[in-house]
Amino acid sequence: MSAQPVDIQIFGRSLRVNCPPDQRDALNQAADDLNQRLQDLKVRTRVTNTEQLVFIAALNISYELTQEKAKTRDYAASMEQRIRMLQQTIEQALLDQGRITEKTGQNFE
C-alpha cells in the first residue's frame, strides 16, 4: 500500500502528511494526543508561544519514550533471567528424574 496525503489539524494549524491507509486511524489518534498535550501545556505553563509549546511537548514525549524504552529493557532482562532459572530447574528435574529411573529401573515413556 502506498502512502496517501492526509490532512490533520494540530493546534489550529492544517498539516498535510503522507500516510498508508491502514495507519490513518493511528495518525489521527496521535494528532489528537498531540493537540491535547499542547492545550494542557498552554494552560499549565501559561506559555503562549506556539513554537515554545511544541518544543516542550517534543521534549516531554522524547523523555516518555526514553523511560518506556528503559522499562522494556528492564523487563526483557528480567524475563531472560526468569527463563534461565526455569531452564535450570527443568534441567535439574530431568537429571533427578533420570537418577530415580536408573535406581528403580522404571521408564516413564
Curated annotation (Swiss-Prot):
A biological process term (GO) from this entry: septin ring assembly
Record's keyword terms, sorted: Cell cycle, Cell division, Coiled coil, Cytoplasm, Septation
InterPro entries the record matches: Cell_div_ZapA-like (IPR007838), Cell_div_ZapA-like_sf (IPR036192), Cell_div_ZapA_eubact (IPR023771), Cell_div_ZapA_N (IPR042233)
Sections of the chain in a coiled coil: 21-97
Keyword check for Cell division: yes
Main subcellular localisation: cytoplasm
Location of this chain's protein in the cell: Cytoplasm
Superkingdom field: Bacteria
This protein's GO CC annotations: cell division site; cell septum; cytosol; plasma membrane
Keyword Cytoplasm attributed: yes
Reported function: Activator of cell division through the inhibition of FtsZ GTPase activity, therefore promoting FtsZ assembly into bundles of protofilaments necessary for the formation of the division Z ring. It is recruited early at mid-cell but it is not essential for cell division.
Family: Belongs to the ZapA family. Type 1 subfamily.
Quaternary structure, from the entry: Homodimer. Interacts with FtsZ.
HAMAP family in UniProt: ZapA_type1
PANTHER family associated with the record: CELL DIVISION PROTEIN ZAPA (PTHR34981:SF1)
Protein name: Cell division protein ZapA
Organism, as annotated: Salmonella typhimurium (strain LT2 / SGSC1412 / ATCC 700720)
Gene behind the chain: zapA
